[in-house]
Amino acid sequence: MKEEGFIHLCQPDSGKSCGACCGLYNYADSTRESLVDRLRNRTRIFRETVKKANDPKVFLNRIRSIESPERIYDTIHCCEYLGFLDDEEKRVGCLLHPLQNDGEDMRDLSFYGRELCAGHICPSYHFISRDEKLSLTRIVDDWYLYGLCITDIDLVKEYFRFISEGICEVPRYERFEGRLKDIALDFFSLKISWPFRSTDANRFGKYYFDGSQYMISHIDYDHLGYERSRFDKIFLSLTSSFRTPDELREGEEIIRKNIEEFISCYKTDAIL
Ligand code: SF4
Ligand code: SF4
């Protein structure tokens, strides 16, 4: 039973969705272009081959014979049944889902099985507040960026904490349109365009895998001769690696300017 006012983060509206827990971003090449190719091919082949109960296995074998299996973390499953749900390629999702197959639920054929796939709720549902959920789903319209951001709890909570402190209230989600939406979108787009992103192959957000367990890749402030930055959590979420104190300062400036611009614009718009 869903609570009143429940916000479905997986499929929030007709313009985007998330497929992160199906392994979407765990491919060695998880650039937008590469994922679009992957999902587009799968969707086409699924529609061509899957007509009856056992066909998904034929589909699976075909996909495995043509796709690169290289992953960031071998321990995280990347499900081949993730594809596009709509012709416009705005929503990613499960090709085995009953809504995609005239009511027939084929998820039992998957690695996790129907029960796990249908019942999974990721930590973002619990830790991201209702206001933050409503705001973020207004700010980000595109599936690729949306999935990266909605699963990054620290990034979301830190940004809203900084702007809330500056405007002395929780920003009202209705305000995320026009210029305010653009400024917030600029911030969340750093998830893709951050200039100080580490190139280490085994990094994902703040985590890296040391061969046996997931560890947080902390920033070595001592080495940079710097105090721990107030934006430390944001830096970690952005997979940062700073080689010099100047790079660290530049990173702080990018974040500071965005937050201050948002605060100023929010206050000015409120007066007008
Ligand atoms: S990571 Fe969370 S929001 Fe994304 S599809 Fe999975 S459960 Fe849904
Ligand atoms: S079968 Fe499960 S893991 Fe695979 S795409 Fe569907 S919901 Fe995701």
Question: What are the functions of these language-model segments?
Answer:
Residues 1-20, 26-29, 43, 60-272:
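Short loop/turn segments that flank or connect secondary-structure elements
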Residues 34-69:
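Charged, glycine/proline-rich intrinsically disordered loops and linkers
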